[in-house]
Structure formats: C-alpha cells, structure tokens
C-alpha cells in the first residue's frame, strides 16, 4: 500500500479547503529542502522527447498541466515539477483582491471521486500576484494566467477588468486564459456570447502578442458550443480549453446547489465537448482538455480526440501526488503500443472526417 493510500482516510476527514492550504504550505516548504524536493522531481517529472511539444513558440516537456484553481495565488509554481507537471495555469486572478464566497465553499464527493467548489475567484489581486511572479519569471515551465473579472464589476465593464489583468501580467506569464465560464461568479457565464467575445479579444489583442485562450463551460448546448468555437477562432483566440466545472449536480446526487463539479463524473461531458470543438476547429488552434482525466488511458483518449495539452487537478486528490507522472509514463507506453514515435502523431487521429460535399 502506498503512503498516500495510508493517509487518505485522514486527508478526507480534513476540511477540503484546509487540506488544500496544507498542500500549498507543503509545496512552498519542500522547495527549500532539496533532500526532499529533488527526489520528488526525479520520481514524478517525465522529460521524454516523445512528449515534447512546441506550441505558441513555448516548449512543453510533457502535455499535463496544472489546472486553474490549484495554484490560485502563484505560490506553488516552484513545486510544479515535483508533482510532474509540464506546465501550468495560476489563478483565477482578478484586478482587485477578493475573499470569494462564504465558507464552507468546497465539498468532496468521495464515492464519485469528485469535488464541488464555490470559491468565487478568491485571490490576492493582480498587484500581489504580479510581484510574486516577477521573482520567478521566466520559469523552466510555461506559465499561464487564468484571468477573471471582479465580482463587483458590472458586466458592461467586464472588458476593462480583463484589460487591466493583461496589462499587468503580460511581462510575467507566457499566456492568458480568459475565464468567462466559472459558475461561481454571478453573471459570468452570460459573457459567453459572440458579441462579448468579439469585443474582448479585439481589445486584448491590442495589448499583447502573447497567446490568449478561452475556456468553455460544459453546460452549454452543443449548437452553442459549435458556434462559439468557430466564433472564438475568428475573434482571435489562440486556443480553447474544454471544459470548466459543471453545475449538473445530479452527477453526484448533491443536495448543495451551488458551485461547480469537477472530477470523474465530468469526464464524459468534457470528452463530448472536446469532440465537438475538435470537429470544428482542430488544426486551426490548439485545444486543451480538462475534466475527469485521472489515468493514462483517459489522457490518451483525449489526445486522440484532438487535445494537444491536458490539465488535471481533482485526480491529485483521489489518486495521489504521483498521478501526473503515472499519466505521462503511461502515455509513452500507449504511444509505443500503437506504433507512434511522438505524441504529435496521435493528436486528433480519432476526429471523424467531415463528409465532403460531392455536388
């Protein structure tokens, strides 16, 4: 039995938010102790040429990244390699500090291997996070910033919040992710429309040459997903992340009707949305898949469906801190088994080809 499996019962008796704060503390402490930190990097970080990719002129050592929400305040970046991550996303960051929603705001659904969170973009604000990133940037791994509007900012002024964030962070991160799909900020998902996306990307593209991605909700109708995928690319999005958390509480029989569900129950819908988006924009912009990825097999399934990169978070809670390394090592074996010499050969191989109009 692994050490993680031995301590899991104790971890699950701890408040989810407190447990996360303890992980944050451990990550920040570990990097100051090479005798502990270096063996973790050696055990978990997979650096194999089969998984190397160059995307947006950035070097990715492996495809598995830190999902937004894990490192909200950019306090754990130094520790990413110790968990095996090849890149990551900090935040969500807002212009002004905000405490987020009232506690409790995180719940485990252990029998479903899921987490429900209603944090509400709690973060220290862009000024503090910018100072923190200045000390480490450029980092050995690509760093993205997940950016969102403050809760108190009205929808009609949302673009201004995103402009502030890009201006402040453009010299300390490698790319941006526009978050308009979190269920935890009232009215935020209403911004997932063509008019706002056009206005937003039109403004942000004038501020930076760095890639700007958009993250989709899994709760949109398929037709809207198709339309927004195409429109996002036309508006200038450099990539699409699918998906954010879901508000389908029936997936975990939750009596708590707030926040978003992540983890294994989201896997099927996240995969479906990936297939829809890939069917529309694969080859035009890179697609990142997140939601319920907890094994090499699931990761490989997403890659074959069109994902160039992947993200995990909840899997660490249920599978342990070695899961990213396991996924990457497993991916190499699966690629070899199918006769591939590089991950790029497998990306999108299962995307159905559209029937050509023979008229």
Swiss-Prot record:
Principal place of residence: membrane
Q: What does this protein do?
A: Catalyzes the conversion of dihydroorotate to orotate with quinone as electron acceptor.
Question: What is this enzyme's EC?
Answer: 1.3.5.2
Recorded hits in InterPro entries, A to Z, give: Aldolase_TIM (IPR013785), DHO_dehydrogenase (IPR050074), Dihydroorotate_DH_2 (IPR005719), Dihydroorotate_DH_cat (IPR005720), Dihydroorotate_DH_CS (IPR001295)
Free-text remark on how the cofactor is bound: Binds 1 FMN per subunit.
* Source species, domain of life: Bacteria
Similarity remark: Belongs to the dihydroorotate dehydrogenase family. Type 2 subfamily.
- The positions annotated for binding FMN are 68-72, 92, 146, 179, 215, 243, 263, 292, 313-314
Q: Which organism is it from?
A: Nautilia profundicola (strain ATCC BAA-1463 / DSM 18972 / AmH)
Q: Topology versus the membrane, per the UniProt entry?
A: Peripheral membrane protein
Q: Which reaction does it catalyse?
A: (S)-dihydroorotate + a quinone = orotate + a quinol
Name the chain's protein.
Dihydroorotate dehydrogenase (quinone)
Stored PROSITE patterns: DHODEHASE_1, DHODEHASE_2
Q: Which Gene3D superfamilies match?
A: Aldolase class I
Question: What are the protein's UniProt keywords?
Answer: Cell membrane, Flavoprotein, FMN, Membrane, Oxidoreductase, Pyrimidine biosynthesis
Cofactor(s) required, per the database record: FMN
Q: Which residues form the active site?
A: 182
Q: In which pathway does it act?
A: Pyrimidine metabolism; UMP biosynthesis via de novo pathway; orotate from (S)-dihydroorotate (quinone route): step 1/1
Subcellular locations according to the entry = Cell membrane
Q: Tell me, what is one Gene Ontology molecular-function annotation carried by this entry?
A: dihydroorotate dehydrogenase (quinone) activity
Which residues of this UniProt protein bind substrate?
72, 117-121, 179, 184, 244-245
Alphabetized NCBIfam families for the sequence: PRK05286.2-5, pyrD_sub2
Q: Does the keyword Membrane apply?
A: yes
